[in-house]
Amino acid sequence: MSRRHVCPVWVGYLLANPVRALFQDPKKILGPHIAPGMRVLDIGCAMGFFSLPLARLVGPGGRVICVDLQQTMLDSLARRARRAHLLDRIEIRRCDADSLCITEFHGQIHFALLFAVIHEVDIAARLFTEVRDALRPGGRVVFAEPKGPIPRHAFDESVSVAEHSGLRKIDGLRIPWSHAALLET
């Protein structure tokens, strides 16, 4: 997707640090929304802070499609997934500046995670539309942005863009240090 600012690789290492799970525990955040066997999208996956726990949650019959713009981040994710014996549950995809490159998943995805990614793209509507198109009817999205650099009004504007793209907000979520919402097709 077009980018305003892309997360530097060195920040990816900080974001993947296991200490982060003390404050933003992926199982607590995502567990209520994931069931074994699901097909899940992790958009802007970076080095896999959420991807690996998602792979555990979907189990051997599920699949996590991990999408990022930066090959270095994806290479790190692949190494981490291999070490965790989860690579068989993860599909790693590099998107480009104009597309998430996920059209073949049209109507097949149960759940998508958009965590700290919208502020990095120029055209949020395009990203939300591609995610909506990939989701099955009733598919859900956890959408979150960091509170520090992203003011509340900017997050609310992004939720409005998501709603204009065909998603609807069904709930607010409480995620430490984040503005967050649960969206649905």
Locations of regions flagged by a protein language model:
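A short glycine-rich, Lys/Arg-flanked "PGG" loop and its adjoining helix->strand segment in the class I
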Residues: 125-137
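Core SAM-dependent methyltransferase catalytic element
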Residues: 174-185
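Conserved beta-strand signature within the Rossmann-like core of class I S-adenosyl-L-methionine
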Residues: 138-145
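A short SAM/SAH-binding and catalytic strip from SAM-dependent methyltransferases
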Residues: 109-122
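A short acidic, Gly/Pro-enriched loop at the edge of an enzyme's catalytic core
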Residues: 38, 98-112
